[in-house]
């Protein structure tokens, strides 16, 4: 693992899930970490240097590194790797605090030969606050964040107005936030929070009025094993997509 990279021990909007890092994940952390893991820092990230060898880079002499998508909480990286392979022209900055998940995504990166992913194993809120300049992102993905089912824990949900305001300010005009959840009360909260952010507009309002503010599943988001299992059990999934104005 690169010097300066450490998995946070404080519980904030997340909880560290129990789970053992497998031998394969540990090997990926050791072998792939130096190239694809970024240490948390309190200064703005240099996207040009970070993605210089990425498939999303637009040439060594071009100051534009290509579109950058932030992903918050990628789990075991199944959807992340799928989307990065589907969109080689885009660069992905992915935040996750679960060490086995980070190892799993690094393993996928190696197996699939992906070059357009970088990972910060740190609390995403602090990454947003300190590493991401204003109007620097082309998109944000937040798929299946912890719903904190109990009412007394709702305040710990990731998607709150303060976070969305920070993300909206860091999106370029025309950039988007895409959230997905399989917990209807959380979907309703997400839709309400994003609707109140003045820098965002709902992409589904005019195109799909029959969905009451929710969006059809975008083509790039795959059905994961977890999601497929839920669908077979009759669980719903809600996609919410808003655009920066």
From Swiss-Prot:
S-adenosyl-L-methionine binds at residues 71, 96, 123, 146. Residues 152-157 are annotated as: Interaction with RNA. It catalyses: guanosine(46) in tRNA + S-adenosyl-L-methionine = N(7)-methylguanosine(46) in tRNA + S-adenosyl-L-homocysteine. Keywords: Methyltransferase, S-adenosyl-L-methionine, Transferase, tRNA processing. It is an enzyme of class 2 (transferase). The active site is at residue 146. GO terms for cellular component: tRNA methyltransferase complex. Its EC number is 2.1.1.33. One of its GO terms (molecular function) is tRNA (guanine(46)-N7)-methyltransferase activity. Pathway: tRNA modification; N(7)-methylguanine-tRNA biosynthesis. Substrate binds at residues 150, 182, 224-227. Gene3D superfamilies: Vaccinia Virus protein VP39 (3.40.50.150). The keyword Transferase applies. The keyword Lipid metabolism does not apply. CDD domains: AdoMet_MTases. It comes from the Bacteria. Catalyzes the formation of N(7)-methylguanine at position 46 (m7G46) in tRNA. Belongs to the class I-like SAM-binding methyltransferase superfamily. TrmB family. This is tRNA (guanine-N(7)-)-methyltransferase. It comes from Albidiferax ferrireducens (strain ATCC BAA-621 / DSM 15236 / T118).
């Amino acid at each position: 693992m690169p010097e300066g990279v450490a998995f946070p021990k404080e519980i904030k909007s997340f909880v560290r899930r129990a789970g053992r890092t497998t031998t394969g994940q540990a090997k990926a952390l050791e072998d792939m970490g130096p190239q694809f893991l970024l240490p948390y820092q309190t200064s703005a990230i240099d996207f040009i240097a970070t993605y210089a060898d990425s498939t999303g880079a637009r040439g060594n002499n071009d100051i534009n590194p290509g579109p950058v998508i932030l992903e918050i909480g990628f789990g075991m990286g199944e959807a992340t790797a799928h989307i990065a392979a589907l969109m080689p022209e885009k660069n992905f900055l992915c935040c996750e605090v679960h060490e086995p998940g980070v190892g799993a995504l690094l393993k996928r990166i190696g197996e699939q030969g992906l070059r357009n992913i970088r990972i910060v194993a740190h609390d995403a809120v602090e990454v947003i606050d300190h590493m991401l300049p204003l109007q620097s992102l082309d998109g944000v993905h937040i798929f299946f964040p912890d719903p904190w089912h109990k009412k007394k824990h709702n305040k710990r949900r990731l998607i709150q107005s303060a976070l969305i305001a920070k993300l909206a300010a860091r999106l370029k005009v025309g950039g988007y936030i895409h959230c997905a959840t399989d917990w209807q009360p959380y979907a309703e909260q997400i839709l309400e929070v994003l609707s109140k952010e003045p820098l965002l507009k709902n992409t589904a309002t005019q195109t799909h009025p029959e969905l009451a503010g929710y969006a059809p599943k975008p083509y790039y988001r795959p059905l994961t094993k977890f999601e497929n299992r839920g669908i077979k059990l009759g669980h719903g999934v809600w996609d919410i997509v808003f655009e920066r104005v």
